[in-house]
């Protein structure tokens, strides 16, 4: 799950960079939503990995 947290963080950074660079005005709003969505998912996965809950246990071993 920690792998997915890192993937979500990278996707949110890329979405933010593309959305705020002036490529498209509409993409900025979508990038903001995706950034916060993936940020929340990444934080949840990191917390689960640290606590050793579910499949995150095998990642931390």
UniProtKB/Swiss-Prot annotation:
Membrane topology: Multi-pass membrane protein
The keyword Phosphoprotein appears for this protein: no
A Pfam family recorded for this sequence: DUF1328
InterPro entries in the record: DUF1328
Highest taxon of the lineage: Bacteria
Coiled coil: none
Keyword line: Cell membrane, Membrane, Transmembrane, Transmembrane helix
Transmembrane as UniProt keyword: yes
Subcellular location: Cell membrane
Transmembrane segments: 5-25, 33-53
NCBIfam families: PRK13682.1-1 (NF010226), PRK13682.2-6 (NF010235)
Family statement drawn from the similarity comment of this UniProt entry: Belongs to the UPF0391 family.
Record-given protein name: UPF0391 membrane protein Aave_0978
